[in-house]
């Protein structure tokens, strides 16, 4: 008996929950919740599957399972931090399930959601439910990032998906920061200027709350850099 069956035997309806995009510099974090009763062959951690295999499995998952998807935007990530934004996306995924689970299996650790559950480290390799959720979240987010590439063709979002690859970092240095970047993340914050941030706000591309949050982070960062430079040159701070 697998781990999913053990929890189903005890709790009844069990959902697997996972996210995609937590470590990216751009785009949302996407979560999926899956309730699966029928066996699907080949489900594994989405990162270990080819894109073509993920797409094929997604079709079967959508046909055989109840699926909920939740998104937390770059703004929410900047305002609430990535851990809390991930929880927000996961709870939204659970809310969007047509079948309401009594227990959830969550990939990771230390994550408490709106439904009772337990966390499994590397859960996408241990649980078919979490593995299915990882596939749904990954494919859905990849499709979103490909749409961003069409909006911003100077960025290869269809390839690096917003992760901190060498290619992506070079694109930021060459083309500048976008509103869909996570402005609170280094090295995005390092490459962001006060003037560009203000331009985003004045054009209505970011909210006032996000503007003030990032402006404060920029100010704190400049203070740290100033102190380091003065210390390195053996100069008094004031």
From Swiss-Prot:
Molecular function GO terms recorded: manganese ion binding; RNA binding; RNA-DNA hybrid ribonuclease activity
This protein's GO CC annotations: cytoplasm; ribonuclease H2 complex
Alphabetized UniProt keyword annotations: Cytoplasm, Endonuclease, Hydrolase, Manganese, Metal-binding, Nuclease
Protein family: Belongs to the RNase HII family.
Superkingdom per UniProt: Bacteria
Class of the enzyme per the UniProt entry, highest EC level: hydrolase
Binding positions for a divalent metal cation per the UniProt entry: 18-19, 107
Entry protein name: Ribonuclease HII
Cofactor note: Manganese or magnesium. Binds 1 divalent metal ion per monomer in the absence of substrate. May bind a second metal ion after substrate binding.
Catalytic activity: Endonucleolytic cleavage to 5'-phosphomonoester
Chief place of localization: cytoplasm
Domain RNase H type-2: 12-197
Localization per Swiss-Prot or TrEMBL: Cytoplasm
Lineage: Bacteria, Thermotogati, Thermotogota, Thermotogae, Thermotogales
Annotated GO biological process: DNA replication, removal of RNA primer; mismatch repair
Organism from which the protein derives: Thermotoga maritima (strain ATCC 43589 / DSM 3109 / JCM 10099 / NBRC 100826 / MSB8)
């Amino acid at each position: 008996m697998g781990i999913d069956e053990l929890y189903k035997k005890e709790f009844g309806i069990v959902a697997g929950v996972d996210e995609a995009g937590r470590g990216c510099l751009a785009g949302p974090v996407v979560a999926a919740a899956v309730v699966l009763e029928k066996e699907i062959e080949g489900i594994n951690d989405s990162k270990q599957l080819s894109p073509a295999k993920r797409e094929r499995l997604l079709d079967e998952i959508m046909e055989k399972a109840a699926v909920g998807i939740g998104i937390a935007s770059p703004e929410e990530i900047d305002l609430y931090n990535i851990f809390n934004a991930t929880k927000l996306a996961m709870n939204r995924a659970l809310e969007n399930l047509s079948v309401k689970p009594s227990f959830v299996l969550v990939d990771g650790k230390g994550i408490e959601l709106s439904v009772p559950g337990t966390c499994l480290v590397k859960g996408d390799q241990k649980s078919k439910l979490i593995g299915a959720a990882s596939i749904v979240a990954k494919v859905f987010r990849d499709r979103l990032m490909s749409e961003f590439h069409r909006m911003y063709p100077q960025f290869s979002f269809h390839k690096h998906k917003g992760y901190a690859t060498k290619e992506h970092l070079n694109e930021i240095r060459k083309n500048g920061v976008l509103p869909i970047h996570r402005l609170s993340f280094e090295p995005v914050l390092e490459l962001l200027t006060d003037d560009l941030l203000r331009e985003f706000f004045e054009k209505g591309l970011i909210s006032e709350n996000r503007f003030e949050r990032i402006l404060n982070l920029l100010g704190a960062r400049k203070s740290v850099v100033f102190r380091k430079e003065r210390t390195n040159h053996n100069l008094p701070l004031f």
